[in-house]
């Protein structure tokens, strides 16, 4: 049958990418359908019960700055919060939260069920309806046809999913869920480059069978950091302790004894796994000189005994898993509630996408999340948000939007994927961003919330809090610049108490704050006044202390923006451009870069080749500027 309502946007999949995509499109006013195989698993944390971390929290904050759900759900579900790299510079500081799976899923579902313009429907999608290279709808497993102007695919690990435990394997999208085989078959019929990747998860442990006294305690920060720019510590549930233990040489011997029955070593798994989250058998094999590996023992929630042993993801046979777990200090009598497993699944080459995450071959079709070769909730959520935004814009015939590399980690993520592709699950790190001093976790709202407001993503409550923060920053910055301290005053004596070289002339509080030995708390004592909002104080301190570095990065960005804004026609014939080697021509044809700057980032494309392209465009009057 044909469903009576025609939608602007259909989102397939209710994981972290799908929920952000659906919420974004609906917030912008598009009539949106979220199609999921099971409404009970909306927002489910399929692997580790945590949000954030190095590079990842930057994405969470950017999602939040654009009105997304992930940070708000984390504040409502976080049972331990920590700031990582707190002693390092502001560019690499990152917030990480341990989350209660049940509370997190409930928070996401509440947002979905109470979002205007959003309809939920439980059915697996089996087919895409494509007419004249344009997607026009979806057909479900029971033959229901949903018509729409745009479709966002966020299929996670479900496309052709195969679960491996030892030499046994079976079809599955994750433990307990069927794979999306019909949809996987349909995508292979379309002009996409399909590959295989794999990921894994550790066995879950019953906390009642664990000796925590044999482990090191790891408490969160107090006071707890807040994930959302509009969040509050009052939202945080009870805070709990995590634990740390380590594998032993006995553990490694047991693991090695199972190598002959490991699907990874036996060649049963063709997909490449995540480099930065390897299985324990991979770690033991690759780092044979190490006699132990760290394991973070993370409770999965306040109302469950289930523990997540972070660091021992595995697809070894269950008998080996059990022996290995029980050789670890504190786990001698451990009961495994769920065995660890590896899952292999289809992904599509992200070089087949545009920066908006729309496919190059089929108009109105967008991909987000693990289907694009990424790993991680945060990477998925950020892509989902961007895909939802652009699906909504296209459905209303409005100009597309995406952030540049100098505007957001989301811009770095997408540009990396579509420019270089990926042969392994892609994870975000701060080191991937060349402008990381500008793309800090703390200023994601200053970078993106105004854009989010223009796009219709940011509600009045968030906009008011953002406006108050901006006003507070301007006011405090002005106070620090205008308040002068004289050496021969009481305030001057207080200042000299912190300085290695005493003041010889009067200085503003801002000048003093630029001195390496002075921090904002000192300034508050010297000036006998401080900003009421600690977020304002942090922002002002960073802006003033790192002003020179930030200014230099801004100048570099301005120089490069000329090429970033020079568009390349997607149908440009590289074969007729003189001076390009066949290798460079092929790389350009494979990627089909959208801008001159993107072309310059393709491995092997030389500055001379970029110059030849510019000359060709100028001769044929094809030079165009874009505003994205």
Swiss-Prot record:
Alphabetic keyword roster: Cytoplasm, FAD, Flavoprotein, NAD, tRNA processing
Q: Which InterPro entries match?
A: FAD/NAD-bd_sf, GIDA_C_N, MnmG, MnmG-rel, MnmG-rel_CS, MnmG_C, MnmG_C_subdom, MnmG_C_subdom_sf
Family of this protein: Belongs to the MnmG family.
Q: Known HAMAP family for this protein?
A: MnmG_GidA
The coiled-coil regions, if any, are none
Which GO terms of the cellular component aspect does the record hold? Answer: cytosol
Q: Does the keyword tRNA processing apply?
A: yes
Q: What does this protein do?
A: NAD-binding protein involved in the addition of a carboxymethylaminomethyl (cmnm) group at the wobble position (U34) of certain tRNAs, forming tRNA-cmnm(5)s(2)U34.
The identity of this protein, by name, is: tRNA uridine 5-carboxymethylaminomethyl modification enzyme MnmG
Required co-factors: FAD
Q: Where does NAD(+) bind?
A: 273-287
Which BP terms in the Gene Ontology apply to this protein? Answer: tRNA methylation; tRNA wobble uridine modification
- MF term (GO), any: flavin adenine dinucleotide binding
Under Pfam families, the record lists:
GIDA, GIDA_C_1st, SAM_GIDA_C
Among NCBIfam families, the record links this protein to: mnmG_gidA
- Report residues binding FAD: 13-18
**Which residues form each disulfide bond in the chain?**
none
């Amino acid at each position: 049958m044909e469903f009576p309502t025609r939608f602007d946007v259909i989102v397939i999949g209710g994981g972290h990418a799908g929920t952000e995509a659906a919420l974004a499109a609906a917030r912008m006013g598009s009539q949106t359908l979220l199609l999921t195989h099971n409404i009970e698993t909306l927002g489910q944390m399929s692997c580790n019960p945590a949000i954030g971390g190095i590079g990842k929290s930057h994405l969470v904050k950017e999602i939040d700055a654009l009105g997304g759900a992930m940070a708000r759900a984390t504040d409502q579900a976080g049972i331990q919060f920590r700031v990582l790299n707190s002693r390092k510079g502001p560019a690499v500081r990152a917030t990480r939260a341990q989350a209660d799976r049940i509370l997190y899923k409930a928070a996401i579902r509440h947002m979905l069920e109470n979002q205007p313009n959003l309809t939920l429907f439980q059915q697996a999608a089996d087919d895409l309806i494509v007419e004249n290279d344009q997607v026009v709808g979806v057909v479900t497993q029971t033959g229901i046809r949903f018509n729409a102007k745009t479709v966002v695919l966020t299929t996670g690990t479900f496309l052709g999913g195969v679960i491996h435990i030892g030499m046994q394997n079976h079809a599955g999208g994750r433990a307990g869920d069927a794979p999306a085989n019909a949809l996987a078959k349909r995508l292979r019929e379309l002009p996409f480059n399909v590959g295989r990747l794999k990921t894994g998860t550790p066995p879950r442990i019953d906390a009642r069978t664990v000796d925590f006294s044999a482990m090191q305690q790891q408490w969160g920060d107090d006071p707890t950091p807040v994930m959302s720019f509009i969040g509050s510590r009052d939202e945080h549930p009870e805070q709990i302790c995590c634990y740390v233990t380590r594998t032993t040489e006995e553990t490694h011997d047991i693991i090695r004894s199972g190598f002959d029955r490991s699907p990874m070593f036996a060649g049963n798994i063709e997909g490449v796994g995540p480099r930065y989250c390897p299985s324990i058998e991979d770690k033991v094999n690759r780092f044979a000189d190490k006699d132990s590996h760290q394991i973070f023992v993370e409770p999965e929630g306040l109302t469950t005994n289930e523990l997540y042993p972070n660091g021992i993801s595995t697809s070894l046979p269950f008998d080996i898993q059990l022996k290995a777990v029980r050789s670890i200090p504190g786990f001698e009598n451990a009961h495994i509630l769920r065995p660890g497993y590896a899952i292999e699944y289809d992904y599509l080459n992200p070089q087949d996408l545009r920066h908006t995450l729309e496919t190059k071959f089929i108009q109105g079709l967008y991909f987000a999340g693990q289907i694009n070769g990424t790993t991680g909730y945060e990477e998925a959520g950020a892509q989902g948000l961007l895909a939802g935004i652009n699906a909504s814009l296209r459905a209303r015939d409005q100009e597309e939007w995406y952030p540049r590399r100098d505007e957001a980690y989301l811009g770095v993520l997408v540009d990396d994927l579509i420019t270089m592709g990926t042969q392994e699950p892609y994870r975000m790190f701060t080191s991937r961003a060349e402008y990381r001093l500008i793309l800090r976790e703390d200023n994601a709202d200053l970078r993106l919330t105004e854009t989010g407001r223009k796009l219709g993503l940011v509600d009045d409550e968030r906009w008011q809090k953002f406006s108050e923060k901006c006003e507070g920053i301007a006011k405090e910055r002005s106070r620090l610049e205008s308040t002068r301290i004289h050496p021969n005053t009481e305030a001057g004596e207080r200042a000299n108490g912190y300085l290695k070289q005493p003041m010889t002339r009067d200085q503003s509080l801002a000048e003093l704050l630029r001195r390496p030995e002075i921090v904002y708390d000192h300034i508050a004592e010297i000036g006998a006044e401080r900003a009421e909002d600690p977020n304002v104080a942090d922002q002002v301190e960073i802006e003033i202390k790192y002003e020179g570095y930030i200014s230099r990065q801004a100048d570099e960005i301005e120089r490069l923006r000329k090429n970033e804004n020079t568009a390349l026609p997607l149908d440009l014939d590289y074969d007729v451009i003189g001076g390009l080697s066949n290798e460079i021509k092929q790389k350009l044809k494979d990627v089909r870069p959208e801008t001159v700057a993107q072309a310059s980032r393709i491995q092997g494309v030389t500055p001379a080749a970029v110059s030849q392209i510019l000359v060709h465009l100028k001769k044929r009057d094809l030079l165009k500027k874009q505003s994205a």
